[in-house]
C-alpha cells in the first residue's frame, strides 16, 4: 500500500515537473544554444556590447529584468506569465542599430522595437506567436539636435516627447512641436502612428510635421526620405509603429508659438443630466473654435461605496495667446462652461507641456527639466479602445454613455476635438486618415491596480466593462468602418492568426493575410489601407518587422534575399 502511494506521488511529481517545464517553455520561446551563440557572437563581432540574455539558472537576471521592466508602461504585459524576449539589445549608435538588425536576422529571431514602451497592447516588447524574439530598445538613441536657421530638428527614435520639447525650448522660446501630452512617450512610435496633441488643431499631427527620416530596413540599410522613396516615407508617417523597419531619427519642422500661452483645467462635476448637457454643447463648440484653441473633456464616475453619486467632468483648455483673449472666446462660444480669469494660467509653451503632463507634483511648472525624466512613475494595468465621431451625439445618447461610465469607478472616457487644421489636411496627405468630417475622437480607458490584477475575475471584469462601453457607443460613432486610432492599439479589433513566415510565396496565403489584416487595417487607416500594403511590400517584402496587428506584404512579389554578417 505504501509502495503504491509512493509510486503515485512520484508520478504526480513527474507530471507537475513536466507541466512546469511546458509552462516555462511557452513563456520563453525555445531557442537553440546554436542560435543564441550565433546572435551573441554576431553582436560582439559588431562591437555591440549593451545587450542582455534571458537569464538561465547559471546567469543572474537582475540586469535583464531591469532593462525589460523599465519601459513596460502597461503592467498587464509585465506579468511572469507573458512571453519574454530571448535577448534585449540597447544600441548606442546607428552602426550598432544596423548591426542589431542584421544579427537578429542571422539568428532567425523575430524583432520587437521599443522606444518609450507605451504600446497599449505591449507589441513593442511581447510576441505571442511562440517564436523566439529579441527586443531592440532605443532608449540610448535619444539625441535631439535643433537647427533654428532651418527651423527643424533631428530627433532620434528613442527620444521621448519630453526630451524633445525640452531640447526645443532650450534653443528657442518661440518654437514648439505638435505631439502628445505624456512626456515619457517615445517619438519613434508616437509619430509612426500620427501623434495628436494640444497643437494639432493649429498645425496638424506630429507626423504632418515630419520632413525627413532615417529608417533602418530589414536588410540593414539606413535610408533617408529620398532613398526609401515617397511611398514608404508616406507610410511611416501615421501607418503604425514597428512594421516598416526601425526609425533611427525623424527630421521635424519646428512650429511657431507665442511667448505667452494660456492653460486651464476646470472640473465640472455633477449629475448625469448636467454633464450630458455640457458635453452636448462642447461637441458643437470645440471642433469649431479658433485654430489657436484646444478644449478637451475627460470624464469618470465618482461613487460612495458602491453607489454612484456624480460624474466628474474635467475640461482641459489650451490657447495660443493671453488669458483675456481665451476667456473672451469662451464666453462668446461656450458661456455654459463658466471659465473665469482665476481658472486660467499664463505661461510659456514649454511650461504648458509640463502643466498638462502626467508627471507627479507638477504644481511648479517652471521646473521644466522634469520633462527629461524617462521613467514613468504612474504605471498601471489598463485597457483602452477608441472611436471617431462624425455627427453630434444627442443628450440622450450621452446619458446612455454615462449610464455605463458610472458602473465603473476605474473607468474613464476622453473626448479630443478635431476641426481646424485637422479638418483641412487631406486624408491622403499621410497614412493617418481621420480628417474632414470628424468632430472628435473618443478614448475609452479602464485602469486598475496590482491587487485587482491578481484577481482574475476582477481583471476580466474590467475588460468586459470597457467592451460593454464600446458596444453601447456603436450607434453614436463612425461606421462602415468603425474608425479607430492606431496609437490606441486595440487587439479586440482582430489579430493576425499567423504571421506568414519568411518562406511562403503562395498567392493564396498572401491574399489571406492582406484580407485578414483588412479587418483592423481599414478601421485604423480607412481608404489608405491598400496603399499601405503596397508600401509594406516595397520596404519589407519578407515581413521581418511585424506584430499581431501589422500590415502584411503581398508575398507573391517577394524577391530572393541573402544575409551575412562578419
From Swiss-Prot:
Keyword line: Alkaloid metabolism, Disulfide bond, FAD, Flavoprotein, Glycoprotein, Oxidoreductase, Signal, Vacuole
Coiled coil: none
Pathway given in the UniProt record: Alkaloid biosynthesis; nicotine biosynthesis
Enzyme class per UniProt: oxidoreductase
Source domain of life: Eukaryota
Annotated glycosylation sites: 50, 364, 378, 503
Major localization class: other
Cofactor(s) this protein requires: FAD
Task of the protein: Involved in the biosynthesis of pyridine alkaloid natural products, leading mainly to the production of anabasine, anatabine, nicotine and nornicotine, effective deterrents against herbivores with antiparasitic and pesticide properties (neurotoxins); nornicotine serves as the precursor in the synthesis of the carcinogen compound N'-nitrosonornicotine (NNN). Catalyzes a late oxidation step subsequent to the pyridine ring condensation reaction in the biosynthesis of alkaloids.
Protein name per its UniProtKB record: Berberine bridge enzyme-like D-2
Organism the protein comes from: Nicotiana tabacum
Amino acid at each position: 500500500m505504501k509502495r503504491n502511494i509512493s509510486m503515485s506521488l512520484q508520478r504526480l511529481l513527474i507530471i507537475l515537473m513536466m507541466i512546469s517545464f511546458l509552462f516555462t517553455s511557452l513563456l520563453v520561446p525555445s531557442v537553440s544554444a546554436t542560435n543564441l551563440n550565433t546572435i551573441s557572437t554576431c553582436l560582439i563581432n559588431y562591437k555591440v556590447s549593451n545587450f542582455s540574455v534571458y537569464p538561465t539558472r547559471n546567469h543572474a537576471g537582475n540586469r535583464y529584468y531591469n532593462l525589460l521592466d523599465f519601459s513596460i508602461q502597461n503592467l498587464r504585459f509585465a506579468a511572469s506569465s507573458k512571453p519574454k524576449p530571448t535577448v534585449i539589445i540597447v544600441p548606442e549608435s546607428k552602426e550598432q542599430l544596423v548591426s542589431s538588425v542584421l544579427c537578429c536576422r542571422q539568428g532567425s529571431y523575430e524583432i520587437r522595437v521599443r522606444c518609450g514602451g507605451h504600446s497599449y497592447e505591449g507589441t513593442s516588447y511581447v510576441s505571442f506567436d511562440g517564436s523566439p524574439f529579441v527586443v531592440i530598445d532605443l532608449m540610448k538613441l535619444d539625441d535631439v539636435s535643433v537647427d533654428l536657421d532651418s527651423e527643424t530638428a533631428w530627433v532620434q527614435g528613442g527620444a521621448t516627447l519630453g526630451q524633445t520639447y525640452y531640447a526645443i525650448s532650450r534653443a528657442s522660446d518661440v518654437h514648439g512641436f505638435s505631439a502628445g501630452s505624456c512626456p515619457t512617450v517615445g517619438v519613434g512610435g508616437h509619430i509612426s502612428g500620427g501623434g495628436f496633441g494640444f497643437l494639432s488643431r493649429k498645425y496638424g499631427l506630429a507626423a504632418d510635421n515630419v520632413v525627413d527620416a532615417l529608417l533602418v530596413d530589414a536588410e540593414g540599410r539606413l535610408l533617408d526620405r529620398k532613398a526609401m522613396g515617397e511611398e514608404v516615407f508616406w507610410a511611416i508617417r501615421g501607418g503604425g509603429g514597428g512594421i516598416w523597419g526601425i526609425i533611427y531619427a525623424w527630421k521635424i519642422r519646428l512650429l511657431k508659438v507665442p511667448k505667452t500661452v494660456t492653460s486651464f483645467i476646470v472640473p465640472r462635476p455633477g449629475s448625469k443630466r448636467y454633464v450630458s448637457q455640457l458635453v452636448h454643447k462642447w461637441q458643437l463648440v470645440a471642433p469649431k473654435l479658433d485654430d489657436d484653441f484646444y478644449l478637451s473633456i475627460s470624464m469618470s464616475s465618482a461613487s460612495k461605496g458602491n453607489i454612484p453619486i456624480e460624474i466628474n467632468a474635467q475640461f482641459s483648455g489650451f490657447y495660443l495667446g493671453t488669458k483675456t483673449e481665451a476667456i473672451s472666446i469662451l464666453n462668446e462660444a461656450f458661456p455654459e462652461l463658466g471659465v473665469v480669469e482665476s481658472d486660467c494660467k499664463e505661461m510659456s509653451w514649454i511650461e504648458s507641456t509640463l502643466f498638462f503632463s502626467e508627471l507627479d507634483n507638477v504644481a511648479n511648472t517652471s521646473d521644466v527639466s522634469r520633462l527629461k525624466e524617462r521613467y514613468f512613475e504612474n504605471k498601471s494595468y489598463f485597457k483602452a479602445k477608441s472611436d471617431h465621431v462624425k455627427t453630434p451625439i444627442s443628450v440622450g445618447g450621452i446619458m446612455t454613455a454615462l449610464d455605463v461610465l458610472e458602473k465603473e469607478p476605474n473607468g474613464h472616457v476622453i473626448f479630443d476635438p478635431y476641426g481646424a487644421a485637422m479638418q483641412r489636411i487631406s486624408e491622403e496627405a499621410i497614412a493617418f486618415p481621420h480628417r474632414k468630417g470628424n468632430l472628435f475622437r473618443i478614448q475609452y480607458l479602464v485602469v486598475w491596480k496590482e491587487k485587482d490584477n491578481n484577481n482574475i475575475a476582477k481583471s476580466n471584469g474590467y475588460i468586459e466593462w470597457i467592451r460593454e462601453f464600446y458596444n453601447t457607443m456603436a450607434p453614436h460613432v463612425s461606421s462602415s468602418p468603425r474608425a479607430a486610432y492606431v496609437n490606441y492599439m486595440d487587439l479586440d479589433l482582430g489579430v493576425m492568426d499567423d504571421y506568414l513566415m519568411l518562406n511562403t510565396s503562395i498567392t493564396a496565403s498572401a491574399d489571406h493575410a492582406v484580407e485578414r489584416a483588412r479587418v483592423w487595417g481599414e478601421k485604423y487607416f480607412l481608404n489608405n489601407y491598400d496603399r499601405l500594403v503596397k508600401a509594406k511590400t516595397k520596404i519589407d517584402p519578407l515581413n521581418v518587422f511585424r506584430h499581431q496587428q501589422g500590415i502584411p506584404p503581398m508575398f507573391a512579389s517577394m524577391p530572393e534575399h541573402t544575409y551575412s554578417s562578419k
